[in-house]
Amino acid sequence: MSRAAPFTVLIPARLASTRLPNKPLADIAGLPMVVHVARRASQSGAQRCVVAADDARIVQACQAHGVQALLTRADHASGSDRLAEACELLGLAGEDIVVNVQGDEPLIDPRLIDAVAALLHARGDASMGTAAHAIDSAEDFANPNVVKVVLDAQGLAHYFSRAPIPHARDHGPGSLWWQPGQTGVPVGFAPLRHIGIYSYRAGFLRRFPQLPAAPTEQLEALEQLRALWHGHRIAVHVTGSAPGAGVDTPADLERVRTLLGG
């Protein structure tokens, strides 16, 4: 696909992590992980890639490798709050497009970043954009750690859930009603796994943390449900391939080190 129209990549990076302390600074092939993320993101069509950090050590590590970084407050409740502050610090206009790339995604595909940014340039009615891909196993469909998304006819998110959605009434009870090759389902149906990358209009991103939390958001522990609850539209890019693995645990880190030669 062609390059997206202008946008900024923001990479939230938080030093505290219960499962992997100092995660943004974890060494991978001689570079901090967050620098790998920024370098991958810079291969997209973004005008600039900026790390929004909660600790001066992250800022220093980024600057040592030529990566732009901002020091944000350490007490933000979520990554969205951190990004909202970054928008203010950068002086982004309300209609400017921002793509949130997680700081633990050193294998992020730059083409996916472009695609998610392009959603908002193409869809003036959407406040957010994100991505999904087809689930290919019954285990993933049933796994609550695999977030599912159902789309409407316009490619907008209808709902996100940790539950296996949609549920097929006529296939009986249980979470494993679907499996690859399942018969008796509508033509073209495939359950979709949500990919945790987002694009926003900067004005909406600044307002988002002030929106009251949604009951569905609190039940599912999925922040994007707040946007749907308050009537905002989320456009979804369906990609044909699964994203590169993120880094949440020491085992994940070792796997990525092997892939990147570290």
UniProtKB/Swiss-Prot annotation:
The keyword Magnesium does not apply. Pfam families: CTP_transf_3 (PF02348). Pathway: Nucleotide-sugar biosynthesis; CMP-3-deoxy-D-manno-octulosonate biosynthesis; CMP-3-deoxy-D-manno-octulosonate from 3-deoxy-D-manno-octulosonate and CTP: step 1/1; Bacterial outer membrane biogenesis; lipopolysaccharide biosynthesis. The keyword Transferase applies. GO terms for cellular component: cytosol. Its main location: cytoplasm. InterPro entries: Cytidylyl_trans, KdsB, Nucleotide-diphossugar_trans. Activates KDO (a required 8-carbon sugar) for incorporation into bacterial lipopolysaccharide in Gram-negative bacteria. The lineage of its organism: Bacteria, Pseudomonadati, Pseudomonadota, Betaproteobacteria, Burkholderiales. It comes from Acidovorax ebreus (strain TPSY). This is 3-deoxy-manno-octulosonate cytidylyltransferase. Disulfide bonds: none annotated. It is an enzyme of class 2 (transferase).
